[in-house]
UniProtKB/Swiss-Prot annotation:
Pfam families: IL17. The keyword Disulfide bond applies. Changing G207R: Defective aggregation behavior. Keywords: Disulfide bond, Glycoprotein, Secreted, Signal. Expressed in RMG and AUA interneurons and ASE sensory neurons. This is Interleukin cytokine-related protein 17.1. Glycans are attached at N70. Residues 1-29 form the signal peptide. Ligand for the receptor complex composed of ilcr-1 and ilcr-2. Binding to the ilcr-1/2 receptor complex triggers a signaling cascade, activating the downstream signaling components actl-1, pik-1 and nfki-1, and results in increased neuronal activity in RMG interneurons in response to input from oxygen-sensing neurons. This leads to increased animal movement and promotes aggregation behavior. Plays a role in the responsiveness of RMG interneurons to ascaroside pheromones. It comes from Caenorhabditis elegans. It is found in: Secreted.
Length: 221
């Protein structure tokens, strides 16, 4: 008895249905809900290894690497001068916890000698400390950021009060979990990576009269 042509077509169609179903489920598993106003087209440089890697577990591998921490390396973003960092108890991480030893008082005396080997933290005009930015619902959960220790540089170094210390902030894309830790979405975290001396807004009142003056701008031709 000859086979029905419809039965043959259905048998050949089964693998296609399985592949399409797998692709649909796979795309839903890796889709991240974005917390942005508009959906801009993603930039996907072909030379990046991320786009060349064929294994399906790359997200799990990367997330494990990104969130891994121990008592000395508890953040993927950390200062290069590791000697300044304190060792923390990983089970007792607290948001805002200071993770460096104090760099001294705001009006401490000048260093007797300063060389190229002197840590940047000790040579900075604005004293700062490193603190822990911790959120257990975030990936990565632990980030290190800078906190200014003093409102302005040491007057023994800069003279009259025409400068103040402000945080230089950066925005970092992270993943934020829901309360049940079942789903996550893209989120933008703002952290301070530096404490820099800047001219304070009322510098003309605290400094010399001729320190700030008007410059006539030429009209471009």
């Amino acid at each position: 008895m000859p086979k029905s042509p419809h039965r043959t077509n259905l048998q050949s169609f089964y693998p296609i249905m399985i592949i399409l179903t797998h692709l649909a489920l796979d795309s839903n598993c890796w889709r991240i809900r974005r917390e942005v106003d508009g959906e801009e087209e993603d930039i996907m440089p072909s030379e990046e290894c991320y786009h060349k890697y064929n294994e399906e577990n790359h997200f799990k591998v990367f997330s494990n690497y990104l969130n891994r921490k121990n008592s000395s390396h508890y953040s993927p973003i950390a200062p290069s001068y590791q000697q300044a960092l304190l060792r923390l108890q990983v089970k007792g991480l607290k948001h805002g916890e200071q993770i460096t030893k104090s760099s001294g008082k705001c009006n401490s005396k000048k260093l007797d000698t300063i060389s190229a080997e002197t840590p940047l933290r000790d040579r900075a005009l604005c004293k700062f400390e490193y603190v822990l930015n911790y959120n257990p619902k975030r990936l990565p959960a632990a980030l290190t950021e800078v906190k200014c220790s003093c409102p302005r540089p040491n007057s023994k170094l800069v003279g009259k009060r025409i400068f103040e210390c402000e945080h230089l902030r950066y925005q970092v894309r992270v993943l934020m979990w829901d309360d049940s830790c079942n789903t996550f979405r893209e989120h933008v975290e703002t952290i301070a990576l530096a404490c820099i001396p800047v001219i304070q807004a009322n510098a003309n009142a605290d400094g010399d009269d001729d320190f700030i003056y008007t410059i006539k701008a030429e009209i471009p031709i």
